[in-house]
Amino acid sequence: IYLFLGAPNERSTAQPERDFYIYMLRPYLKTPFKDEQKPDELFFELNHSDDRFEQFLKRYAAADDLKIDATPAMKNLYQRKIDSYFKELTKWLNDNFVTTFNITYRGKKGSVLDFGMFLPGNATIQEIINIVAEGLLTDWFAQKYPDYPIFGEIKDGYLSKSNLEAYVKEALQCLMGKETRMGLAILNGLVLLDNSNKVTAKKSGYANWVKALLETKGQGQVLNYNELIETIYIRGVEDLQYTKEFRLEPELLVVVLAAMISAGDLEITIDAKTYNATNLNEYVQLPLSKLSR
């Protein structure tokens, strides 16, 4: 997901493609653009404010401007004012976001409440945006990636860069018998549990995909990392990595492979050391950055 400050026609063409685009439209000096009502575009726009917000915004802008040519001593004074005004602006936005911002998705416009979103008490702006995005973009994601796992038991309802590593580590510990709610949520989403919550790789389409690739190999041949993972580069720099089937994050593939090791379906060699069902405990203790590479 990309979060842009501005309109679609202000987005740099150099930016790599993403599955979703969230736009925070300019509240002032608005840029005209045509809403093409795309299923992967979501817009937030400040609909109205009040005198308090306007005053703090003007003071913030003035202090930021005056700081440029100020003496070192005055720069510190203006920076304190900038920080103070920014804090007030942030508080106002947190307190009033639900009632003062409009959402537009596929031509429909309204407030968070108009879209029927359930928000937890004291939700931050980031949490509100995440909840709205999940609620409105989930159907499109399911159409685009129908075989991507559903993690319905995850606390926040979705995986993100900020929580993925923690969930994956818990899932790996579950394979060692240390069951946690977080770990089971990942294993369940990857179809690595039977009806009794026991680990199995037999029913998982993700595990069966890996197994099918292994079966195409001749005796003594190995399945290499780059046969499972697609790496996307932008101007020669690594941007994203996904599995070639299902578009799984490499971290989720680690869980699938670990479950297959546990079941005796495969062995993995990392840095000349081979891991199988007898030393799975050593495998899951490796840094996730090494396991997912």
What are these model-derived regions, one by one?
Residues 1-293:
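Extended alpha-helical scaffold and adjacent linker segments that couple domains
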